């Protein structure tokens, strides 16, 4: 009987000093899929940035892009995002910045309102695919 094919799973470690001690990986590759754990508006030092939703969205998507690069992907490879906004009234401003990062084909997206636990206005998860 032939052996069932196995899927390679690769974990990408947390590098941000502000969250390095959390028990998580920033991304996991399973086959051709890359799952990016929730990213927020932290700068390179791990500090939540100041500013309105536009600044938080821009920093968060830069962080998503950086994590994707660890796995050899770009925002062009993203097929799905999940977004948590702390304030639903920020939806229009968020969308304007989001559209800058996804100018062509847009990934599927779910957007919810939720109280974020780390003091940021937004959190984004992403799923990418690269064969």
Question: What would you call each of these model-derived segments?
Answer:
Residues 1-62, 66-76, 85-131:
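N-terminal presequence-like segments and the immediate start of the first folded domain
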